[in-house]
């Protein structure tokens, strides 16, 4: 990354003059030099440099013992010990009003046994005296192919708070009512809307589409989560100018969301290539070869600059020989819920039980 590109990134993030002009509402306990930065190195080293009670939200998706350790797979107990040490530090730096969202999947051991990690992580948070708020199920329309088991189509997000007094804002994350105009038909409220006009609580089953090769946010990172899912978490548990920490920030999804929602971010990523790409996404600019890390960054750049024909640019996940199209956009959660419902209805209509009934 060139010096000019780095200056452009700093300008985009309001990081000029080494953060000397940051607003004075930032808590003095949090080092200003860390705000809106991605630490390239071990996450424990980053965490040890953060003061107690200085972060408003911790949200992350730790490596599930794959990809990050190359060919050096850790035994489950060793992996959990390492994660416990990280979580202890996250608890220490979290403000009393703060939340931790820890997205976990499944650990597959050498014999092929699938162990859901949420049941192993729950006691870790509980041992720190944290308060469980939700076990969120993230359902995806599509999962990995499987021949000897049911295909996995969900992961879990554990939400814990440090104290019983925590931040939570429902209105910014409400979703449309199923029957938006439904009214009370009797009683004192007859004729009034039966539901909240702002929408309903989204519940603890989320249907955000997983980031894959046909998703506009897709980069070279193997386990990327969608921005709209992190947006829901940030909006519901923080306020503008709060500090969001991601100890495994990867390609900077959490950083992008925090920046777009006027929050400060800090995170760690051990892979230098991922850090460079994260900063490029944050800058919204092409590299020296007119390439973007993903389709979304390219589309936003063209929309911002009034570019109709993007043929002079490329993006990393672009298919060979194809021209970039600006039409592809990520669908909202409601779209994916509809996909899931339609799939369930299709399976019900074509079930073996239904066929047997029809034959009788």
Curated annotation (Swiss-Prot):
Enzyme class: transferase
GO cellular component terms attached to this protein's record: cytoplasm
Keywords: DNA-binding, Methyltransferase, Restriction system, S-adenosyl-L-methionine, Transferase
Comp. bias (Basic and acidic residues): 326-341
Gene3D superfamilies (UniProt xref): Vaccinia Virus protein VP39
UniProt-annotated stretches for the region Disordered: 316-341
GO biological process entries: DNA restriction-modification system; methylation
Reaction(s) this enzyme catalyzes, per UniProt: a 2'-deoxycytidine in DNA + S-adenosyl-L-methionine = an N(4)-methyl-2'-deoxycytidine in DNA + S-adenosyl-L-homocysteine + H(+)
Keyword Ion transport listed: no
Keyword Chloroplast: no
Molecular function GO terms recorded: DNA binding; N-methyltransferase activity; site-specific DNA-methyltransferase (adenine-specific) activity; site-specific DNA-methyltransferase (cytosine-N4-specific) activity
Family statement drawn from the similarity comment of this UniProt entry: Belongs to the N(4)/N(6)-methyltransferase family. N(4) subfamily.
Protein name stated in the entry: Type II methyltransferase M.BglII
């Amino acid at each position: 990354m060139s010096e000019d590109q780095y200056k452009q990134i700093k300008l985009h993030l309001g990081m000029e003059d080494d953060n000397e002009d940051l607003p004075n509402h930032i808590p003095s306990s949090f080092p200003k030099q860390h705000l809106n930065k991605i630490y390239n190195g071990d996450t424990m080293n980053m965490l040890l440099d953060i003061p107690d009670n200085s972060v408003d939200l911790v949200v992350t998706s730790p490596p599930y013992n794959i990809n990050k350790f190359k060919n050096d797979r850790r035994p489950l107990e060793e992996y959990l010990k390492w994660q416990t040490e990280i979580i202890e530090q996250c608890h220490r730096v979290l403000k009393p009003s703060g939340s931790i969202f820890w997205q976990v999947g499944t650990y597959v051991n050498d014999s092929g046994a699938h162990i859901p990690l949420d049941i192993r992580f729950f006691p870790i948070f509980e041992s720190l005296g944290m308060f469980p708020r939700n076990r969120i199920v993230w359902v995806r329309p599509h999962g990995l192919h499987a021949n000897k088991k049911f295909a996995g189509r969900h992961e879990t997000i554990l939400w814990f708070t440090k104290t019983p007094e925590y931040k939570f804002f429902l209105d910014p994350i409400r979703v449309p009512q199923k029957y938006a105009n439904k009214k009370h038909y009797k009683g004192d409220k007859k004729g009034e809307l039966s539901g909240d006009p702002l929408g309903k609580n989204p519940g603890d089953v989320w249907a955000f589409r997983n980031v894959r090769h046909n998703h506009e946010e897709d980069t070279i990172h193997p386990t990327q989560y969608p921005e709209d899912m992190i947006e829901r978490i940030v909006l519901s548990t923080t306020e503008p100018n709060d500090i969001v920490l991601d100890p495994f920030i990867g390609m900077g999804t959490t950083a992008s969301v925090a920046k777009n929602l006027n929050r400060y971010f800090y995170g760690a990523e051990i892979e230098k290539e991922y850090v460079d790409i994260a900063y490029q996404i944050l800058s919204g600019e092409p590299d020296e070869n007119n390439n973007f890390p993903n389709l979304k960054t390219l589309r936003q750049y063209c929309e911002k600059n009034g570019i109709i024909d993007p043929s002079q640019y490329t993006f990393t996940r672009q298919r060979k020989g194809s021209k970039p199209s600006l039409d592809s956009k990520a669908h909202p959660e409601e779209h994916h819920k509809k996909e899931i419902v339609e799939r369930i209805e299709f399976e019900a209509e074509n079930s073996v039980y239904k066929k047997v009934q029809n034959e009788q």
